[in-house]
Amino acid sequence: MAGLKSFLASSWLLPVACGASQSIVPSTSATAAYSQFTIPASADVGANLVANIDDPQAVNAQSVCPGYKASDVKHSSQGFTASLELAGDPCNVYGTDVDSLTLTVEYQAKDRLNIQIVPTYFDASNASWYILSEELVPRPKASQNASVPQSDFVVSWSNEPSFNFKVIRKATGDVLFNTKGSTLVYENQFIEFVTLLPEEYNLYGLGERMNQLRLLENANLTLYAADIADPIDDNIYGHHAFYLDTRYYKVGGQNKSHTIVKSSEAEPSQEYVSYSHGVFLRNAHGQEILLRDQKLIWRTLGGSVDLTFYSGPTQAEVTKQYQLSTVGLPAMQQYNTLGFHQCRWGYNNWSEFEDVLANFERFEIPLEYLWADIDYMHGYRNFDNDQHRFSYEEGEKFLNKLHAGGRRWVPIVDGALYIPNPENASDAYETYDRGAKDDVFIKNPDGSLYIGAVWPGYTVYPDWHHPKASDFWANELVTWWNKLHYDGVWYDMAEVSSFCVGSCGTGNLSMNPAHPPFALPGEPGNVVYDYPEGFNITNATEAASASAGAASQSAAASSTTTSAPYLRTTPTPGVRNVDHPPYVINHVQPGHDLSVHAISPNSTHSDGVQEYDVHSLYGHQGINATYHGLLKVWENKRPFIIARSTFSGSGKWAGHWGGDNFSKWGSMFFSISQALQFSLFGIPMFGVDTCGFNGNTDEELCNRWMQLSAFFPFYRNHNVLSAIPQEPYRWASVIDATKAAMNIRYAILPYFYTLFHLAHTTGSTVMRALAWEFPNDPSLAAVGTQFLVGPSVMVIPVLEPQVDTVQGVFPGVGHGEVWYDWYSQTAVDAKPGVNTTISAPLGHIPVFVRGGSILPMQEVALTTRDARKTPWSLLASLSSNGTASGQLYLDDGESVYPEDTLSVDFLASRSTLRASARGTWKEANPLANVTVLGVTEKPSSVTLNGETLSSDSVKYNATSHVLHVGGLQKHTADGAWAKDWVLKW
């Protein structure tokens, strides 16, 4: 949940149709706000800046800066170093030019290359301007046996007309990164380098943002963590300076020569191959990446050039190389986290949670976790329950009941902490007192406390650079858990957000607790009237009423505004202006001011580092502190954290949700590309606020979205205060649709869990783009409307209203690939390179199983605990040559270091299916049945370990070519995988 100012100011990509709202009365914490001091709206208004890319007066650094000349080149077995000296008079265009730089080219491993350019001279006073601490973001290390000859890369360089370099793939001679024809600009507040790209390039990543899967040419990509309700094509919560570049080649001639091709010109009959590589810039400063015709322009507000290249040559290999060497492998999630999660802003007391739980049970909808938004807090304060509505005594009773039923509860924890009113002796807050005693809060440049504003009023911020901050945070988590046995942490608002510019609480603490500088949803002037696109067609009367209400509210809120003149900052040699840097990135907040809705760039950490240099790391460091704090709550239990603000490497501690989206078809559409982005970034535990957060949802959108999200790793429904309720049991059709999709999700939970184990141990992905799984088909390069779960399950959702069919592609069908419909279990009749029209009436989501796959499955239950107690089954989908394979991983589902594990390999060929297990985890549930798809002839007999099975247990459908073998429990009474077995037909 984000600052509502961003929601109120936002506009949507698609046309909005309004409808009537059913208001929920805000919680007592919200209604009490009417008697509070309200922070003025003007407090969150910053300077009016013009983004450089939109500024007609902006100077093009490439045209005025001299670049550098390389000299004093020294070679070693692992690369070379050189001195780079300014090649002319300083341009000082957006800062002060650095005269002397040091270049280091290090061939770190066969598949990895690092190029670093840093100032030759710096000291403790300015090191953080350029050097990102390895304690914050580790640098990849060279392998012991790394050398130039064994590398997949070659680096060449030239001084004509100024220093430039190329990174070349040895295998193909393709130039992957090429700064020729451009100038390196390196200043204390501005770095720019340019690389050439092929025509119609295929780039993915560079987030966080909501956009198409494949990045668009002419896109302006800003990286700077921001608290903002999900806009399109703007920077939002996270910072991931990593991209995947895929290039397709036509293979032809006797020597199989490779010619690069555009994906739009691919022909189904032609043979292609692809090569992918990855590029990561280890830099935490604000950034802007401009994609232009056949080039990429990379600009930063400081730091250094610290580029790592990954040779791939497939997407899967690039992602593994990035994670294994650089950012770390994803956290292994608890098994239960793969169940369904229900949340909303507006559950006002424990009784409402009781009602929600009862309704899920009444309608027999699986439910694993209930989530609490800021409603549970005493005055919106972290680690402190409202004792009237969420008392610890009642909470203990409710959580005991919840836990006994195999379910769990997760509360939200925000990035800021309330600071008590010094003139009110009863305004006590022990968390603040303990933090103040250890002096662990961020300061102003003069050493005074930096005091911003968030939900509770005026607030302070943990300083993650302080040596005692993480222990302080861990102690608060432990102390709170001893009062209330929560089951994870939802870490929010850590971009880090503030509802005012500067240290606005300084001198104003007597006003605390203060109301935010905007109306909360449901308060006068902010009634939620918004509905999804198309609502006016299906609900005309209600839509007309809501439209009138929205118009009246808008008219009442209208006022005459004046625009402040644009502020332009002129660089002063030797001096940094961190509040208004001379180069203005296209930051999403009003006026592009870095101080708006965030703590100021000049706020200062205990080690002297200014927020300007590490802003986008705040959430990442808070996740780290939360992860290790939870390990003190539960010593050997995997911490469960879902966080909003992330950085490269956050996935080793937490999952992520897509933030404050909208109840719009557009938000649902972009949720797929959001999820696939985070697959690349090494954060596979990803989901979105299903049915939408901001605004009111409707039955059709929620029906489709509950089905789509059933195939995302993190599956949660969540919406905003005072919007209509949207739990899946609110509409009969949504109940049916939800249960239909959950029947599939819960059946394949063992497959999901196995995928997470593989991600955790190898760096593989859970959700996959078609182009990544089928790398030799250029026509798939931009497909972002369907996706794969692992290698075996493909989902083709409906993403628009009022339709009952959907268009989808079936990769590989022209090269022997077979796809089976999940529901009919028959092979799909599809042609290569063209869309297939698929029936998809409301309540049905098309799902397909890839030939060659074996899926281990269990039965559906209302909790994952109970689902894990059910018999096993296997779904074997034969390839065109009659083979299939799969695997299964099991453990206790929660231990950081499980003592007992089990791995099972499945292999089918020549009418034989084998299961081979290894490990010490005891799985007592028997095998109930095996279903084999694509069996072209009725078998004369079926045997298990040589024993002929009775004809009653064997069924064959000659039309669908499905073989079903049941009644296997008695043959596997000791457990489905207690011993190896062979099934023949």
Curated annotation (Swiss-Prot):
Residues 1-25 form the signal peptide. PROSITE patterns: GLYCOSYL_HYDROL_F31_1, GLYCOSYL_HYDROL_F31_2. Keywords: Glycoprotein, Glycosidase, Hydrolase, Signal. GO terms for molecular function: alpha-1,4-glucosidase activity; carbohydrate binding; glucosyltransferase activity. Its EC number is 3.2.1.20. Coiled coil: none annotated. One of its GO terms (biological process) is polysaccharide metabolic process. Glycans are attached at residues 126, 145, 220, 255, 349, 424, 508, 536, 539, 602, 624, 661, 835, 881, 929, 957. InterPro entries: Gal_mutarotase_sf_dom, Glyco_hydro_31_AS, Glyco_hydro_31_C, Glyco_hydro_31_CS, Glyco_hydro_31_TIM, Glyco_hydro_b, Glycoside_hydrolase_SF. Gene3D superfamilies: Glycosidases (3.20.20.80), glycosyl hydrolase (family 31) (2.60.40.1760), Golgi alpha-mannosidase II (2.60.40.1180). The active site is at residues 492, 495, 660. Induction: By maltose. Pfam families: Glyco_hydro_31_2nd (PF01055), Glyco_hydro_31_3rd (PF21365). It catalyses: Hydrolysis of terminal, non-reducing (1->4)-linked alpha-D-glucose residues with release of alpha-D-glucose. Belongs to the glycosyl hydrolase 31 family. Hydrolyzes malto-oligosaccharides, but has a low activity toward soluble starch. This is Alpha-glucosidase. It comes from Aspergillus oryzae (strain ATCC 42149 / RIB 40).
